[in-house]
Amino acid sequence: MYSAEEKARVKWACRRGMLELDVVIMPFFDECFEELTEAEQQAFVSLLECDDPDLFTWVMGHGRSDNLAHASMVDKIVEHNLSKLR
């Protein structure tokens, strides 16, 4: 599991160069990160290392990551945000 300091670093990494990604990724981190499995947390952190244009494409559903862990995490992020609209 992540220490408080490590979580703070992950939260900082959630801040992207695109507001559109901030609006999608930050709430997921705040509301879901603690409940993810260790493998899912690692996939989330790894996902944050991807370039913003790629993340935006995946989140918008215009493409899919070749990395299965990233694709699965994007699905979780999108589903979380869609569930808030229902």
Curated annotation (Swiss-Prot):
It comes from the Bacteria. Gene3D superfamilies: Flavinator of succinate dehydrogenase. Keywords: Chaperone, Cytoplasm. InterPro entries: SDH, SDH_sf, SdhE_FAD_assembly_factor. GO terms for cellular component: cytoplasm. GO terms for biological process: succinate metabolic process. Its main location: cytoplasm. The keyword Secreted does not apply. It is found in: Cytoplasm. It holds the Pfam family Sdh5. Belongs to the SdhE FAD assembly factor family. An FAD assembly protein, which accelerates covalent attachment of the cofactor into other proteins. Plays an essential role in the assembly of succinate dehydrogenase (SDH, respiratory complex II), an enzyme complex that is a component of both the tricarboxylic acid cycle and the electron transport chain, and which couples the oxidation of succinate to fumarate with the reduction of ubiquinone (coenzyme Q) to ubiquinol. Required for flavinylation (covalent attachment of FAD) of the flavoprotein subunit SdhA of SDH and other flavinylated proteins as well. This is FAD assembly factor SdhE. It comes from Aliivibrio fischeri (strain ATCC 700601 / ES114). The gene is sdhE.
